[in-house]
A protein has these predicted regions:
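Conserved catalytic or regulatory cores that recognize and/or transform ribose-phosphate-containing ligands
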Residues: 1-128
């Protein structure tokens, strides 16, 4: 097995954004589950996916600023962001949406379906 067999420099990176916190522990787990389901759908569609919900699941939730700082650095390196249903009610997801717009990162919304990665005539991947 050789790493170059798996590296695709043209594969776009997409960031999953949506609610994390909820009034109950079960609500938080449900939000993590929804984000991970979206992550899985995006992987199947051909994206390299960053899902912060999975990165911070079950971690100390007392100081979200630590995670926001980490997420901002990761989002800055992404080609696109995928906004889950309910993102408008999440302070963190609203911040990520605003950053994506300011930085010119392509924004997709769950209501529009999973964006498909497609090949162009020259064989390079493009956003669908």
């Amino acid at each position: 097995m050789y790493w170059k067999d798996y590296y695709d420099d043209d594969q776009p990176i997409i960031y999953v954004a949506g609610p994390y916190n909820a009034p109950t522990e079960m609500g938080i787990m449900d939000n993590i589950r929804k984000a991970c389901e979206a992550r899985d759908d995006l992987v199947v569609a051909g994206w390299a996916v960053v899902c912060p919900h999975a990165n911070t699941a079950n971690m100390d939730n007392e100081n979200p600023d630590i995670y926001y700082r980490m997420d901002v650095k990761i989002l800055a390196r992404c080609d696109a962001i995928y906004m889950l249903h309910g993102w408008e009610n999440s302070p963190g997801a609203r911040m990520e949406h605003e950053m994506a717009l300011e930085w010119g990162i392509t924004v997709y919304y769950e209501s529009g379906g999973v964006p498909q990665r497609r090949a162009s005539a020259d064989g390079l991947s493009k956003f669908a």
